[in-house]
């Protein structure tokens, strides 16, 4: 809704501007400084500026709008458009009149007959079948349906704790009120979802409360055990298993080994064979290809780098001349009478017959 706002001068005005035709956005107030002239004029962030001192802002750039605001010396007239904000409030019609929704946190009193089961929630006395001493018959209880009608309430003068279970089973949905010396016990048992609480446990608790109030020792009922007829197969099976001594369980493999050990060599059962533990073979007993090579000079095993010459193995440090101990790696070597020599000492040991010259022959590459 467009409206005119006048800010008295001089600057500063106390608001921040954004947008313009160069940003393809309208001129919008984005920030108001608290306590400024803009705040006193009730400007709000989000107000769209339609005109500045009578000049429309449809074709103004951001810089033009700032210049127009700076040019205002005595007062600044702005035409703004503020979107209406409507607060949603639910409407509740009652007797043809609309009024706002009423929220009341206080609990309202409800009628006694509000509940669906239509039972009288006020406690009623009960009657015990076969016992008429000290018990009064309520006028509003129907023994067949267990329902009660609103009528005068009468309380019991005397009560026996052992008769509570019988009375509660006859009318499980009727609350019980018991007047005891100095104590008033009200027991209201309602239906529980999915039989969450046991009726016997509830009655045991109630009987204990009444016995404690009367000064008697509560007699707890013994737990009922399921009796098994002695003639049944289940009873005989349980009785036999209880008397027979149990033997330790063994796996199938140990049982077979035990039978083989107990039986002699002649009376061995058919279809069985002797079982021996596997013997771990020594790794060195493998084929010749897996043997550790032995050095031809020092006689010890070679681990790692090895030098082979005429099917003989040597350590790299043992591959030397037999006379001068010169390492023959990357050099020529000669075998003379089973020994390894360099070229110089090999010539000295190989003297040709008279009339012959010594010629060194190298293997072809």
Curated annotation (Swiss-Prot):
Single Gene Ontology MF annotation: muscle alpha-actinin binding
Domain PDZ: start-end pairs: 1-84
Residues with PTM Phosphoserine: 18
Domain of life assignment: Eukaryota
Region (Disordered): 126-156
SUPFAM superfamilies: Glucocorticoid receptor-like (DNA-binding domain), PDZ domain-like
InterPro entries xref list: PDLI1-4/Zasp-like_mid (IPR031847), PDZ (IPR001478), PDZ-LIM_domain (IPR050604), PDZ_sf (IPR036034), Zasp-like_motif (IPR006643), Znf_LIM (IPR001781)
Keywords tagged on the record: Cytoplasm, LIM domain, Metal-binding, Phosphoprotein, Zinc
Positions with biased composition (Polar residues): 147-156
Domain LIM zinc-binding, first and last residues per copy: 293-352
Function summary: May play a role in the organization of actin filament arrays within muscle cells.
Protein name: PDZ and LIM domain protein 3
